[in-house]
Amino acid sequence: MVEPSEKPNTQNDDVSKQEIRNPVSSSSSTSDKEKVAKKGNSDATKSLTPEDLDAQLAHLPEHEREILKQQLFIPEVKATYGTLFRYATRNDMILLAIVSLASIAAGAALPLFTVLFGSLAGTFRDIALHRITYDEFNSILTRNSLYFVYLGIAQFILLYVSTVGFIYVGEHITQKIRARYLHAILRQNIGFFDKLGAGEVTTRITADTNLIQDGISEKVGLTLTALSTFFSAFIIGYVRYWKLALICTSTIVAMVLVMGGISRFVVKSGRMTLVSYGEGGTVAEEVISSIRNATAFGTQEKLARQYEVHLREARKWGRRLQMMLGIMFGSMMAIMYSNYGLGFWMGSRFLVGGETDLSAIVNILLAIVIGSFSIGNVAPNTQAFASAISAGAKIFSTIDRVSAIDPGSDEGDTIENVEGTIEFRGIKHIYPSRPEVVVMEDINLVVPKGKTTALVGPSGSGKSTVVGLLERFYNPVAGSVFLDGRDIKTLNLRWLRQQISLVSQEPTLFGTTIFENIRLGLIGSPMENESEEQIKERIVSAAKEANAHDFVMGLPDGYATDVGQRGFLLSGGQKQRIAIARAIVSDPKILLLDEATSALDTKSEGVVQAALDAASRGRTTIVIAHRLSTIKSADNIVVIVGGRIAEQGTHDELVDKKGTYLQLVEAQKINEERGEESEDEAVLEKEKEISRQISVPAKSVNSGKYPDEDVEANLGRIDTKKSLSSVILSQKRGQEKETEYSLGTLIRFIAGFNKPERLIMLCGFFFAVLSGAGQPVQSVFFAKGITTLSLPPSLYGKLREDANFWSLMFLMLGLVQLITQSAQGVIFALCSESLIYRARSKSFRAMLRQDIAFFDLSENSTGALTSFLSTETKHLSGVSGATLGTILMVSTTLIVALTVALAFGWKLALVCISTVPVLLLCGFYRFWILAQFQTRAKKAYESSASYACEATSSIRTVASLTRENGVMEIYEGQLNDQAKKSLRSVAKSSLLYAASQSFSFFCLALGFWYGGGLLGKGEYNAFQFFLCISCVIFGSQSAGIVFSFSPDMGKAKSAAADFKRLFDRVPTIDIESPDGEKLETVEGTIEFRDVHFRYPTRPEQPVLRGLNLTVKPGQYIALVGPSGCGKSTTIALVERFYDTLSGGVYIDGKDISRLNVNSYRSHLALVSQEPTLYQGTIRDNVLLGVDRDDVPDEQVFAACKAANIYDFIMSLPDGFATVVGSKGSMLSGGQKQRIAIARALIRDPKVLLLDEATSALDSESEKVVQAALDAAAKGRTTIAVAHRLSTIQKADIIYVFDQGRIVESGTHHELLQNKGRYYELVHMQSLEKTH
């Protein structure tokens, strides 16, 4: 095979001693400093354009380029508004047609009233000229007033049908989009996820689908009603007198031009805002899912700033969008008022010329007033439609993407009897997300059926890639993989994955019971449809085989125990054993073990390894291992170095060869002579002793007491303050959820976000008031205009003069409205986007401030919190920006209109005002119902979003289990539940909304009947009547408009209460508290004095039971023991993630609970089992170890050299500026771990905590890193938790834990001589040559 020209020419022996280097060798002219300076863009979550992809893959041959492109390319969907309805069923479309007709009919009701109004105007003139009697006048007046009542009833029914129908259809279609989106996500190839963060999926499935729902629900009905009003009004105008109507229609062209020109900018800004929020969501998801790491390093501030970078970008585009909408609204109001002026001016000329009469002009003018006013109601909704289209384009681009490797496809063959012979022929592999690195080069390997083949080698050498290729997570760029002589590309993918069981290095469990988690292994197997009894037997049998049965039965709920999100309620070893049980329960033909026992302690590993050895008999097994003791008995051991096979053979053959394998063995060898005790005896002993307790959180805190009597008595004797505070804390948590806030408190709280904008907000309020006063002023001009047109023919000269004057006044009013509306639009855009920015930023910081116990609660899962950040902050803006400005504007309109009406005709005004309280009551009641509905709906969507996030972040496990259909069933069930719950609430709230909107007709009927009577008696003149009526019409409509914003206000109230609760929550261990003694220097003595501990979320499970432990300054101590025995808990207590229930942890004789937590933690550094990296460059990730930015490059380089990662970093094209991807996805486990170690070392800590710090490293790297850690530990107090005993044999003291107590302690030599528990653990990990 021809190698690419960029590949280094030589493969020297050093390669076996370090990570595989990047084949694209960096330019020698680039200095270290320059590399560090090159800041990489975190664009891992952006969908790539074809041009971007071609540029990235330009260095590869064409056929390789095509293979990688297929795995990465996301089509760009040009979404239109119609695209949003692509999943509407025939019933949906019929319902849409019905409710659309109802909306249109409801819109036609208001212009029909102008016909009645024009008719009455003629009647008023007749009575004034004594052409009809008072009785005749009264009869006509009563009949027309009844017509108003009929119109009101019709509009009530039509609006109710329209609102309920649109909300129902909107929710129904959005539900399908959510389901299709998750379905599409689950069908994508793994390379797609290497580019897409889990946080972005959460943002799409919550915030973006909510935007679509907003754009296809009740706002469509409101818009259709407004448009119908507009067109009906103009049709009526044309029927009455076409010339005048035609002249006024010219303004429509101006409106269309304004809306069309501005909406292009609106759509672009909306799209860019969503992109920025998606990237921010991924950062938030990364940080929240690794909160322990962020807390340990005190990097909350730095990570919050990283999140804010994306928020600022979103704020920039959001402001542009809102400003353009403000200017558009101002322009439309100006055009509308100019239209009035034009109508009056030309109408007066047609009247004088005898071409039409007063009745027709009044009808046309009023129709134009109402029609033009209604178009203003369309503008606020255009933003919702634009956002929906932008969100739709992003979601549909994923839905329409045809995956290169599609697990949902029915294509491909199956093999009737699988034997299990696997062959890799001429494999060359490049990961799609890192096209510059060749991971595998010319691999030829046969895995015989029924045999065990082990893969070993340095991390990053391509071992796990074998699993990825066999499972078809990726397609190789050259060569093929064969199963029983058939190319796996020709086989059905779902069927293929069902023949293979995979246990990976970091096991993923789902948020359900232990029983259901193991049962997932049966998907697609013949046993899946057996009886419940048979399935139960299989599951228990698999759990026993995997050495999980005993610990499961030790749990209060046994197999029905819920494991929590991603299994966080179990320790690493417990999770791993459940995963093994899941893998073997279906008796698979092919078993893949990718570091399957790496998370187990030595005792468990011995038994589980024996179980795996038994399970692998008679089936094809591929084992990937760093710990070589686990693969001694393999039929063939393949050593992979630098993406190539270096050597292969049995353990004995390879040891005799004295090649690379022997070097790996030597690195892990424990140099002690051991007795003759057989491993079998140790295994039997292990089975007897394995009973122990789970060491992590569960659901709720009831009390701080122990059910265990001895311990309870002990606690009663101590009766510490902390034990009491734990009880109080649990009670406080119970109360937290019940906290209710008054509306005033919440408004003050929301206003606090805009404190810096107070002055410009006052300007905005000033302009909003001026804008609001425009409507009543227009009523005065309108009444004056009608009075002018009522003048008799003898005064036509004065009529022309007055008409000219009032037409000019309308033009002036239009110009004033252009300035005031645009100004308030721009001002509130600044305020609204600042509010969203600060709310997101502060709530993210409030989350990062919380203690670890907060994140252990099931309702605070990563998905729920990420979803909260994306959706609730958007809802909060329901009382800011455009909404707040509009509410203030229409409130001013209502107040000024009613005041003017009272000033000019108090009798008629008082009668009309009497109806306004009823309107207000309807609106407020609807607001209250929507707030209730919002709270309930949010909870349902939150749980479904959290579930979707969990499924996506575990995509490899979902894919290998072929669990896609099961995930979809649960998700669709959650969506259906939510839809059923919301329908009843919608029906109630829509009833009140329809009432509040149609009540204005009853108000008009009353006003016309009573006012007409006053006019008929000669008590009022035409000016007073028309002024009062038009003021009340617009006043009532304004009240109706305020309540059309109720959904936004309802959401805002619900969101504000959630925010207030989060902000008011003061954690027990508060990083923002200045209290406590600050430590300038630390000696490093650490003591545990009779420490008892249970996790707050699982109080019935004791974890530490009277732990006593002393670490002297500079001492290196190691903690070993079975998983779940309390080792990692000890580290967590040293870090003060939790407070002890009784007893205390002391540093230099000081109780750590009385120290300032930030000051205390600054002297510690933690390297945990699962390395956590964040989006950004390698340099950024190393610098997260310190809380300052001005760290010299030399210090960064030194830390990386000490962690044995410097050479690898410098071999990358961008050096320290290399982007690590979402959660460090661009790097191997070993590379990530060494960067995490560099991050700890740059901190120069006095106390070093190593929680399985080298478990992810291969033997070669481990030896070097361990030496570096040993060197780093000098002069430092070091506590190391280890499963691999070769890493801690030089420890000053080794403590052996069992069930929360220390059962043995001493040096490595002393403990071996004791021949106790430690001796047994060492014996199991022996790497002696088998005989």
Curated annotation (Swiss-Prot):
Region (Disordered): 1-50
Stated induction or repression of this protein's expression: Expression is induced upon exposure to amphotericin B, the allylamine terbinafine, and itraconazole. Is highly over-expressed in strain TIMM20092, and azole-resistant strain isolated in Switzerland.
Membrane topology: Multi-pass membrane protein
Any Gene Ontology biological process: oligopeptide export from mitochondrion
Cross-referenced SMART domains: AAA
Cellular compartment(s): Cell membrane
Chain sites annotated for binding ATP: 457-464, 1121-1128
Glycan attachment sites: 293, 529, 860, 1108
CDD domains the UniProt entry points to: ABC_6TM_Pgp_ABCB1_D1_like, ABC_6TM_Pgp_ABCB1_D2_like, ABC_MTABC3_MDL1_MDL2
Residue ranges of every copy of the ABC transporter domain listed in the record: 422-667, 1086-1324
Composition bias, Basic and acidic residues: 31-41
Summary of the knockout phenotype: Impairs the resistance to itraconazole of the azole-resistant strain TIMM20092.
UniProt xrefs under PROSITE patterns: ABC_TM1F, ABC_TRANSPORTER_1, ABC_TRANSPORTER_2
Domain ABC transmembrane type-1 stretches: 97-387, 764-1051
Spans traversing the lipid bilayer: 93-113, 147-167, 219-239, 242-262, 325-345, 358-378, 762-782, 808-828, 884-904, 910-930, 995-1015, 1025-1045
Pfam families: ABC_membrane, ABC_tran
Reactions this protein catalyses: itraconazole(in) + ATP + H2O = itraconazole(out) + ADP + phosphate + H(+)
Keywords annotated in UniProt: ATP-binding, Cell membrane, Glycoprotein, Membrane, Nucleotide-binding, Repeat, Transmembrane, Transmembrane helix, Transport
Misc. remarks from the entry: Dermatophytes showing reduced sensitivity to antifungal agents have emerged in several countries and, in particular, up-regulation of MDR2 expression in some clinical isolates such as strain TIMM20092 leads to increased resistance to itraconazole during clinical treatments.
Protein role: ABC-type efflux transporter involved in the modulation susceptibility to itraconazole.
Family: Belongs to the ABC transporter superfamily. ABCB family. Multidrug resistance exporter (TC 3.A.1.201) subfamily.
This protein's name: ABC multidrug transporter MDR2
